Amino acid sequence: QWPDGDKKITTDYGFVNGSLDTDGKMAVGLTFLNNHEVFTDYNLFQVNGAFAYNININSDWKLRLGIEAGYANKNYNFSSILLADQITKTTGSITDVSGDPSLAGYKESFGYFDISSGLLLYDDNFWFGVALKHLSTPNIAFTDVADVPLSMFLSVQGGYSFDIGSFDFIFRDDVNLLVTANYMRQSQYNRLDFGGAFEFDKFTLGTTISLNPEGKSDESQILTSINPFASIQIQRFVLGY
C-alpha cells in the first residue's frame, strides 16, 4: 500500500496445502504472513498450520470444518523513536539514548500463540461461511505488566452463482454471474464487502464495493472503496489483477 510514500505498508502472504486421502475428506495446509510498516518499523510475522474436514451431507450439500493454529512474532524498533530529551535545546543536536521513563519495560519483540476456526456450507452454486479468528485472545502488549488482549475477528461470507446463459453476440461460452458478500467485525471496527463478477470459460471480470456500515463519527464515510478485478485462466494457471 502507498508504495511511493512515507506510509508504505508491505504485506507478503504464502501458503501450501494438500489432501490427506484420496477422496478429499481431510486436508492440511501451512500459511505464512509478513506485514511491515515503513513509517513505524513495525513488523508482524506469523506461521500457521491448518486442518480441514469435509462432510457430505447429501448428494448436493457439503459441510467443511476447519481449524488453524500457529505462532506470531511482533517487532517494533523503539530505537527509531525520537523523544524530547534526545534533542539539545541550545544546539539542536540529537543524542542516541533517551532517559524517558515511559520506555522502561518495553520489549522490542515478543511472540504469542493464536488459534482460529471456521466452517463452510456449500453446493455447486451457493456457499455460506463463518470464521472466527484469535479465539485465544492473546496478550499483544509490548510490556510484561500490561494486558492488551487481541480482540476476536468475525467474518461472515456468502455467495451464489447464477447461470445466465451465453452471450452469442460476444462469446459462445456459457456465462455465470457470481454475487458475493463478506461482513467483517473486530472490536468496534466493521466492514462490509459485496460485489459481483461475470465468469466466462477462461476469464472473470467483476468488481467489489467496500462499505463502513457502522460509522463511528459524523465524518465517517459509508463507501470506502471500489475495487475492480479481472483474471484469466490458462489450463491450471490463473493470473489475476
Regions found by a protein language model. Name each.
Residues 1-241:
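Subset of outer-membrane beta-barrel
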